Amino acid sequence: DATALREPERIPMCPMLGALPYNLEGSSYRAAMYNYSEASEALVKFYQEFQPDATTHTGFTSGKANELAQSTMIDWPGRPGTSVPDFSTHQVIENEYMDENEYPELLKDFTGFMLRKYIPRAFPSVNGLADIRFVPSIVLNTTPLASLYSRQAQEAFSLLAKIGEEDAKAAEASNAVSNRLADLGFPPMFTGAGEAPFDIIGDYYRGTLATLTDQLEYPEELEAACDMMADIQIESWQYFKYAPLPVKRVFFPLHKGMDGFMSAEQYEKIYWKPLKKCML
């Protein structure tokens, strides 16, 4: 009823909890990234004790996978050399992974930009992907595949396989504890995730300050990038049409639509318009 904007019999409670369940139940957020069985038990105890109406645990993140990838946009408890304490959630490190002159490349060839520029910058251990490219002339043999079997690319593929194995372990544990909680009467609050397209550019590509500056210096490119991010997300949500999910709700945090940093016209054009496109 509450989701449908009808008056419910009682107020539903399903707060976003972060590291709280682990810390209250004798575990830690570090365990949520490295010791899934311990973290799962903490989650079950927490939900049984406090009885919220739904779970907001969206899945375990693999600390080992992020170590292998040398992830640069977060720091996390358990990473060798980290200063993040075990009880803390991961910490975001905002960087510019795309400079202002690269909007045309992003818009013209999103996949190519991700392979050759974004992924090597955000995950340096797989920078062997940076040389992957295809030349369309004289496709009579395997020559166009050369960049895929270069030594650097093969090293990146081998490491990606190891990263995938670690992420698969996290996904398996996440699904197991989610099913267990559902059987106990705590269904998931969300079965998908997304962001306002402007926030995607600000969070993961240009950084907050650069994105706000781009409103003035590269408004057309920023608007086009936001529209593209809306389309990419809409395509990614098509599974909602077919998958037998217990609920069909998307976790959708809003980060950067701040009236102190954009005019009403800018908000309408580059924040609200692509966000509304995602919603409708």
Q: What positions do the PLM features span?
A:
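Domain-level signal for soluble alpha/beta catalytic cores
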Residues: 1-5, 19, 27-32, 68-132, ...
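Active-site loop segments of alpha/beta catalytic cores
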Residues: 1-36, 42, 53, 120-280
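Short C-terminal domain-edge/linker segments immediately following a structured domain
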Residues: 42-48, 86-92, 220-225
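Glycine-rich, N-terminal phosphate-binding loop and its surrounding beta-alpha-beta segment
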Residues: 42-83
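Short secondary-structure transition/capping segments
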Residues: 57-66, 90-113, 232-240, 271-274
